[in-house]
From Swiss-Prot:
Gene label: nqrE
Membrane topology per record: Multi-pass membrane protein
Protein name: Na(+)-translocating NADH-quinone reductase subunit E
Catalytic activity: a ubiquinone + n Na(+)(in) + NADH + H(+) = a ubiquinol + n Na(+)(out) + NAD(+)
Molecular function as annotated in GO: oxidoreductase activity, acting on NAD(P)H, quinone or similar compound as acceptor
Annotated compartments: Cell inner membrane
Length: 202
């Protein structure tokens, strides 16, 4: 149990998707103007990462990995080169299924997140999570915990940035830095803050 708790904490703080690896920057900057919308997108990212990571793990471990098809009498087949394409397909399919499910059963939540759900398909933080899973050889349970932790890390970062950007509207920012300029500086300072966790061994 300790291993999974440390994996979750490491995913949220030490290896923050947005502020340590700078993944998902396009939506991170574009949707961080209001806290409400940032939290909505953050929750959607948590759900998608929490679902796609274990699904991709099952597909990779049982079909794509070198020797994974031994159960089918094909122990020498290595389909790992199809990993990237498979992960993209799984992410796109699961986002569509999630979108249709929310539309049918939870229309209020769909109306709140509907605009942001398609953006998640092209969020490289989702793909990054699956590639880290393969590189670090996580099992199914570790993939699930890491997926949820990575989603929480991205949601935490975008919510924090949105809060700061809302306050910056009332600040006296120099003309040359208004808009994206001060946003990039803010992200850099937030990233420096999260670097303080880099020495933590879990």
């Amino acid at each position: 149990m300790e291993h999974y708790i440390s994996l979750f904490v490491r995913a949220v703080f030490v290896e923050n998707m947005a502020l340590a690896f700078f993944l998902g920057m396009c939506t991170f900057i574009a949707i961080s103007k209001k806290v409400e919308t940032a939290i909505g997108l953050g929750v959607a990212v948590i759900v998608v990462l929490g679902i796609t990571m274990p699904v991709n793990n099952l597909i990779y471990a049982n079909i794509l990995k070198d020797g994974a098809l031994a159960w089918a009498g094909l122990p020498e087949v290595d389909l790992s080169f199809l990993g990237l394409l498979t992960f993209i397909g799984v992410i796109a399919a699961l986002v569509q299924i999630l979108e249709m499910t929310l539309d049918k059963y939870v229309p209020s939540l769909y109306n709140a997140l509907g605009v942001f759900l398609p953006l998640i398909t092209v969020n490289c933080a989702i793909m990054g999570g699956s590639l880290f899973m393969v590189e670090r050889d996580y099992n199914l349970a570790e993939s699930t915990v890491y997926g949820i932790g990575a989603g929480v890390s991205w949601a935490l970062a975008i919510a924090a940035l949105a809060g700061i950007r809302e306050k910056l509207k009332y600040s006296d920012v120099p003309a040359g830095l208004q808009g994206l300029g001060i946003t990039f500086i803010t992200i850099g300072l937030m990233s420096l803050g999260f670097m303080s966790f880099s020495g933590v061994q879990l």
